[in-house]
């Protein structure tokens, strides 16, 4: 008996429809980092079967995994790669994030299909205005530029970064025939008219940072009670015996630990309109919780649920939904419900 993730197909597709309605753009579904912990194949399969034909991933391995599992359409690789033949064989669109890549592409024995990543101020990855001027003077018959994009660092820098992006886009020939994407989940409502797509990850999964965008939670994380023990005051619990029972009741062991990506000590979990309190340190495979209420072994407790949503938990534990979700391990079983 182990932890399991339940994915709501209905809520995922609802969120997708709301995103399209708000942005009025085509959607690039970002399924990197195992679809933010929800399950890359589970999420991509639902979306592809529902007509989504553009995906973005972080690694070449993720892209190939999708192709091997019959996910069609365009797959954009966000990281830098020099494995051009491998990308070409799986019809992966790469990102050009540095001018030095152009020299590599000159030597490529196969055509390279790419999007240009523009650095508009975040200073992480991307080409500068000067880089674009250099690229314009290259004659590369094996390079096919199919898109251009950038990434916004924060709300306060949006206008400045958008201005830089627009200026650089105007320098690139034939932009009428390529994909242009700037806005991610937090900026869907600000997508400029000259862009063709929005690049959406966390919003697909029910996390909204836009007041007018009401979304539904896609993921529930449940764990079974594998052991119940009656405990008395001052009994000690867990590694280093740091946990101390403060009143008589029941100690419940659940199979979720830092090997599952649940590394922090989560102080509360919701169950049957009440909360259970964690006692002791989080172990590799287990956590222990206390309650005065008596529950049965084999019952499932929800760790993330509509009553304790991801955004609320992230706020309580001084974390972010990105961190909580993306850390969820591959070893947690994923199940799709309609």
Across the structure, where does each feature detected by a protein language model lie?
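Active-site-proximal beta-alpha core segment in soluble small-molecule metabolic enzymes
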Residues: 3-14, 25-179
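Active-site anion/phosphate-binding pocket segments in diverse small-molecule metabolic enzymes
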Residues: 2-8, 13, 81, 98-100, ...
């Amino acid at each position: 008996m182990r932890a399991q993730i339940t994915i709501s197909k209905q809520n995922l597709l609802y969120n997708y429809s709301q995103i399209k309605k708000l942005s009025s753009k085509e959607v690039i579904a970002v399924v990197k980092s195992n679809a933010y912990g929800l399950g890359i194949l589970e999420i991509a399969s639902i979306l592809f079967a529902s007509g989504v034909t553009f995906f973005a991933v972080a690694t070449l391995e993720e892209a190939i995994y999708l192709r091997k599992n019959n996910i069609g359409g365009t797959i954009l690789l966000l990281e830098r790669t020099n494995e051009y033949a491998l990308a070409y064989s799986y019809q992966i669109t790469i990102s050009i994030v540095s001018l030095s890549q152009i020299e590599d592409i000159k030597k490529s024995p196969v055509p390279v299909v790419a999007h240009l990543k523009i650095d508009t101020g975040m200073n992480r990855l991307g080409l500068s205005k000067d880089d674009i001027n250099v690229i314009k003077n290259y004659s590369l018959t094996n390079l096919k530029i199919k898109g251009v994009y950038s990434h916004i660092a924060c709300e306060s820098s949006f206008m400045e970064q958008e201005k830089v992006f627009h200026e650089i886009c105007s320098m690139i020939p034939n932009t009428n025939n390529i994909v242009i994407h700037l806005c991610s989940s937090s900026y869907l409502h600000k997508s400029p008219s000259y862009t063709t797509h929005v690049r959406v990850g966390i919003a697909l999964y029910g996390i909204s940072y836009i007041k007018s965008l009401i979304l539904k939670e896609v993921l529930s994380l449940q764990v079974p009670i594998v052991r119940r023990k009656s405990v008395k005051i001052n009994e000690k619990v867990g590694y280093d015996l740091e946990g101390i029972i403060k009143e008589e009741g029941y100690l419940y062991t659940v199979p979720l630990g830092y090997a599952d990506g649940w590394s922090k000590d989560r102080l509360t979990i919701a169950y049957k309109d009440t909360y259970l309190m964690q006692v002791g340190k989080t172990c590799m495979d287990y956590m222990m919780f206390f309650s005065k209420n008596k529950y049965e072994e084999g019952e499932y407790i929800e760790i993330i649920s509509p009553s304790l949503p991801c955004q609320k938990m992230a706020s309580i534990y001084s974390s972010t939904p990105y961190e909580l979700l993306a850390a969820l391990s591959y070893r947690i079983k994923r199940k799709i419900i309609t």
